[in-house]
Amino acid sequence: MFSTTVAEFANELKKSTATLLEQLKSAGVAKTAASDKLNDADKQRLLSYLQSTHGAAGAERKKITLVKKSTTEIKQADASGKARTIQVEVRKKRTFIRRDDGVEVSAEAPALETEQEVEAAPQVDNLELARREEEARRQAELIRRQEEELSERRRQREEQEARSREASEKAAAVAAEAAEAAAAQALKKKSKPVAPEQPAPNPTEIETAKVLAAAEKEQHLAKEKGLAREKELAESKARAAEDVVRAADLGDRRRKAESEAAAIRLMMSSPAKKAPPPPKKPEEVKPAMKGTLHKPAAGAVPAKPAKPGAPGAPGAPAAGAAAGAGKEVKSAKLSSSWAGDPAKKKGIPTRGATAAPGAGRSTNWRAPARGGRRGSSDRDRDDHRVQAAPVEQRVIEVHVPETITVAELAHKMAVKASEVIKHLMKLGQMVTINQPLDQDTAMILVEEMGHKAIVAALDDPEAFTVDEVSQQQSESLPRAPVVTVMGHVDHGKTSLLDYIRRAKVATGEAGGITQHIGAYHVETDRGMISFLDTPGHEAFTAMRARGAKATDIVILVVAADDGVMPQTKEAIKHARAAGVPIVVAINKIDKPDANPERVKNELVVEEVVPEEFGGDSPFVPVSAKTGQGIDALLEQVLLQAEVLELKAPVDAMAKGLVIEAQLDKGRGPVATVLVQSGTLKTGDIVLAGSTYGRVRAMLDENGRTIKTAGPSIPVEIQGLTEVPQAGDEFMVMADERRAREIATYRAGKFRHTKLAKQQAAKLENMFTDMAAGEVKMVPIIIKADVQGSQEALAQSLLKLSTDEVKVQLVYTAVGAISESDVNLAIASKAVIIGFNTRADAGARKLAENNGVDIRYYDIIYDAVDELKLAMSGMLTPDKKEEVIGTAEIRQIFKVSKIGSIAGCMVTAGVVRRTARLRLLRDNMVIFTGELDSLKRFKDDVREVREGFDCGLNIKNYNDIQEGDVLEFFEIREVARTL
């Protein structure tokens, strides 16, 4: 007897030795070590145990059918010569049969022969097996529930039938009693003698007749109820029989499902076997066919030709299989074991082949047959159209990103772009195939076309930056506070910082006002402090907001002689929004008209309460001129910093905020950044908004080159590819490729979002602009020294727009004015405004030759005032009516061919020939017009003054009377201002 060890058997079964020993122990085979011997009896006991455990059915025949479906596309020209794409779906199936002798046989479709060898059973993994078992369990549970519902319905129906039967029996008993009583009363009446004459009708007889009629009616009703009850019983029996048949069908289905699942489990647990080749039948020689390209198959039997156009009977495939059982199909040897659907495997006619009549009509679906009658091909196409099954519209889940073009959206919905454009036209939007759509519009369109719109998850490479930053774990150490100085314009913010830094910045600024954010750090006796100096002018709101965002403490500077002003209130709002503490510095206390108490009261109204009033904001009176109170101010700032316990990691990749950015002609893009955490080094890869680059050089606020910058240190970096946006966050990346990918992604995302919003705004305002008429535009190109000034100037100029004159910003950028800017101004007829920047020689010469106006400004007030003046000149003037004189009609002269001549006396002002007039009668306006002629004596005159008489003729009007008053007026144009 052949035997093997447990370890070898486990290796053969691809199982662990411990698992096999546990199964052997459960099967009753006492094996304890991997070296124990196993004989055939032990293996048979293990197999029986596994079959009983996995629910294998006995010797019943099992059949498993696997189906494969593939879809391809072909291009075929139709009758008109146009190429069409046709989808071809091929379905193949394979059937496995488990016979009594344990041999697996692969049964193909009836129309095909059995293959010589059956391939090994496909290996299905444990997940697939678990899924099939779960599906079989759910099917059995569903069948059980259906059986319970059927039994409950049958029980309710039987109870209802019993109740109706009892009610009908009671009604029949009552009717029988009434009939017996009526019959007894009738017999009693018949036994009495009849009188010779007809007496008057007896009331008793009338009552008896009524009783008899009622009894007959009740009998009739009882008979009808009996018939109805019999009919209902028959229907209930039929329904019960149907329920029994349905329950039996459900039981069969459940048993089949369970047996199929058991067969799958058994097949997966046992090794694959090959079926013995089927016995060969005696070969018959098939006569050779003429005019064919195919070789005659060996052992083929000629098939009986079918009737022309006759549809195949249901038993035709089986008969065909029996007739061709001995054929050897050459393609069957070459193809895989997947068999095609027999309904579609029909002969394809080839060149020169002799086909059966009508065979080509149903098989050659690619193109209509050449020749023949036209009606025949039309009928073939109609038959093919009738046989095509209706296709249901698929509901697709469309993931819609922030912006998507029309072509991409059509591709996601599997429709043509023209259909999407058509639906958008119905929704009131005129689009092109490459036009980007915003997310809301795209989602509405997807829902309109019957699909499901889902907000797409951002495929954002920026998520990697979050992971990289979160992975950096470094010890947080105390850092210096970042202090922002805010307040109204000319309240002494920069002068205060100059005294602290021992510098003179304010004297060198244009107009004596700050127009940039200045970043400095100062070493004091108690530690270092970083200062941000923000502009106070109203145009620099965005700069002040950026300063408050990057700060830890805000110093609010208020002039003691001026009090709380609009930008002071705005600075308080920015500090509240950033959630940072406020230290109030009451400046200019050295002036004789200083009033610190008034400043305190005004700030209390703005909810900035001093500490002596029970608030949380320290107030320090200072003087930037004499230095009074400066030390106390720094003391309060450092005290607030100690309370905040400011910390940041030092030994980590730097992260911070872009405070200001500019384009330097010699150094390229330059950005002033504030390091908030980590350490920035020369050579680091920096990502700032949609730009990136390697730090080539770092300068401090004094212009000295430094190698590293820690937390709370403002530095100026060089090496970026473009000028970043002020206010963008910057971070150091470990990989330059990753930084480039993220920067490119951000730039494309910003561009698509901007285009989509612009297009939506254009479509929304199209009809409004058409109704409003033509609006005068002032095209402007702005070039500034830094990005913050360019942003502030653009916002200030846009605020000047009115309903009649609008400011159009053609282009805004930082850097010097170049020839490309002048060419753009020539094309757009724009005015170039240079703010703290100049044009190079080539740009100046090109502008002079083409008449381009270039304006240079150093103070933002001047730029705004001059543009306001220019826009005022473009406004349409107001028309104002001015009365210049009155005249009274004293006499009327009738002149033929001329009409009525009025003799008038000028009572006030002057009467001019070119002026317009009103005819007043009883202080009511009768006519408004103009003069045809004005004469004094016989001479034509241009005007007649007060106290003189004149004769005049009113143009196209003769209905004048004596005593009427003529009022003369002129319309003058008055210039408007913004």
Swiss-Prot record:
Residues 107-129, 146-387 are annotated as: Disordered. CDD domains: IF2_eIF5B, IF2_mtIF2_II, mtIF2_IVc. Residues 512-516 are annotated as: G2. Residues 478-647 form the tr-type G domain. It comes from the Bacteria. InterPro entries: DNA-bd_dom_put_sf (IPR009061), EF-G-like_DII (IPR053905), IF2_assoc_dom_bac (IPR013575), IF2_II (IPR044145), IF2_N (IPR006847), P-loop_NTPase (IPR027417), Small_GTP-bd (IPR005225), T_Tr_GTP-bd_dom (IPR000795). GTP binds at residues 487-494, 533-537, 587-590. GO terms for cellular component: cytosol. Residues 487-494 are annotated as: G1. Residues 587-590 are annotated as: G4. Residues 146-169, 215-259, 375-386 have a biased composition (Basic and acidic residues). The keyword Protein biosynthesis applies. It is found in: Cytoplasm. Pfam families: EF-G_D2, GTP_EFTU, IF-2, IF2_assoc, IF2_N. Residues 533-536 are annotated as: G3. Keywords: Cytoplasm, GTP-binding, Initiation factor, Nucleotide-binding, Protein biosynthesis. GO terms for molecular function: GTP binding; GTPase activity; translation initiation factor activity. One of the essential components for the initiation of protein synthesis. Protects formylmethionyl-tRNA from spontaneous hydrolysis and promotes its binding to the 30S ribosomal subunits. Also involved in the hydrolysis of GTP during the formation of the 70S ribosomal complex. Belongs to the TRAFAC class translation factor GTPase superfamily. Classic translation factor GTPase family. IF-2 subfamily. PANTHER family: TR-TYPE G DOMAIN-CONTAINING PROTEIN (PTHR43381:SF5), TRANSLATION INITIATION FACTOR IF-2-RELATED (PTHR43381). This is Translation initiation factor IF-2. It comes from Albidiferax ferrireducens (strain ATCC BAA-621 / DSM 15236 / T118) (Rhodoferax ferrireducens). The gene is infB.
